[in-house]
Amino acid sequence: MSSPDLLPLGEIEFRYARCRRLLRTLAPDVGGMLVTSRLGIYYLTGTLGWGLVWLPVEGEPVLLLRKGVERAQLESPLRHILPFKSYKEITSLCAGCGSPLSSAIAVDKNGFNWSMAEMLQSRMEGVRFTSCDAVLAQARAVKSEWELE
């Protein structure tokens, strides 16, 4: 599906490159970032879903949604868009797409309340969390040509 309202693949790839470059600078020990805020998900995928997106430093991103997978497949050029029910599934679903989580990941901590953050960490044993809020803020601060049109 192609529409002027849809986020072009080139724009998404540009955003990924910018986020990855910032991750390497601001959080060089992480293997990628897990974004849970709806605004962050939209920025990285072009669809406004309830779930999360895993953007590894190397490899393909994975969008996991609680619902609305069919709509996301129409709106987003991502190859890996899957449903999920529990945070316990995140590790295996990402690995199944060829983009496994690393032992250290960046998470948009502003997108979580205290209890949700604790639940996510308890479901992902052995994974160390750091913040990617500065990465997202800096990436979104500089507008691309497409965003300025």
Regions found by a protein language model. Name each.
Residues 65-92:
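Compact, glycine/acidic-enriched structural inserts
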